[in-house]
From Swiss-Prot:
Every KH type-2 domain range: 39-109
Cellular component, GO annotation: chloroplast; cytosolic small ribosomal subunit
Compartments reported by the entry: Plastid, Chloroplast
Subunit structure: Part of the 30S ribosomal subunit.
Keyword set includes RNA-binding: yes
InterPro entries in alphabetical order: KH_dom-like_a/b (IPR015946), KH_dom_type_2 (IPR004044), KH_sf_prok-type (IPR009019), Ribosomal_S3_C_sf (IPR036419), Ribosomal_uS3_bac-typ (IPR005704), Ribosomal_uS3_C (IPR001351), Ribosomal_uS3_CS (IPR018280)
HAMAP family: Ribosomal_uS3_B
Organism (species): Ostreococcus tauri
GO biological process: translation
NCBIfam families: rpsC_bact
Name of the featured protein: Small ribosomal subunit protein uS3c
Length: 211
């Protein structure tokens, strides 16, 4: 059943941490979850070229701290920080309550091993009509060269414009989905092609962590 469980949610508290860290009263919980979702979706749609791999949100009484992990921090911050300041003001305007919003940016050291970066790069290549097998091979080669223990990529849809949709996958190294201590990163992406939407799934094994 390991393939039917979300690999990150399956490992929360062992090798993965919660992306949102805060406490709330039961009556406020749904509202704050909706706010978190709004912040994430807005930031990703506002800066699609920033290579954001993860967004962590923590809350205090009247303060929200948002940490962006990105492969291209300059695209997120701007030349003199004006892009980040503008993003903070726009997020603050979208929140229903007036609160202090603090943004932090952390550079992703190895984007070649980040599942979301790999998936989005594959989607970009497929939209440019690059052959899907070559795209998968190149992504696997880069991830393995960066130090990944294993990687699996699956692409689904009307591949090469075929009449019948199918899925194809490629794997190199070990990707143990049942091993909870395995540090598995997982992400999905979509490619809009002239034949329809292609779905991309990426699993990256970065090693094992002690429980």
């Amino acid at each position: 059943m390991g393939q039917k469980v979300h690999p990150i949610g399956f490992r929360i508290g062992v090798t993965q941490t919660h992306r949102s860290q805060w406490f709330a009263k039961p009556k406020d919980y749904a509202k704050l979850v909706e706010e978190d979702l709004l912040i994430r979706e807005f930031a990703e749609s506002r800066l699609p070229d920033a290579g954001i791999s993860r967004i962590n949100i923590s809350r205090q009484v009247d303060r929200i701290e948002i940490e962006f992990f990105t492969a291209r921090p300059r695209a997120l911050v701007g030349a003199k920080g004006e892009t980040l300041t503008q993003l903070r003001d726009e997020i603050k305007a979208k929140l229903p309550d007036t609160r202090n919003v603090a943004l932090y940016v952390t550079k992703t050291q190895q984007p070649e091993m980040e599942a979301i970066c790999i998936a989005e790069n594959i989607a970009e290549q497929l939209e440019k009509r690059t052959p899907f097998r070559r795209t998968m091979r190149q992504a696997i080669m880069r991830a393995r060269k960066a130090g990944a223990e294993g990687i699996k990529i699956q692409i689904s849809g009307r591949l090469n414009g075929a009449e019948i949709a199918r899925h194809e996958w490629a794997r190199e190294g070990r990707v143990p989905l049942h091993t909870i201590r395995a540090d598995i990163d997982y992400a999905t992406a979509r490619a809009q092609t002239i034949y329809g939407i292609l779905g991309i799934k990426v699993w990256v094994c970065k090693g094992e962590k002690s429980c």
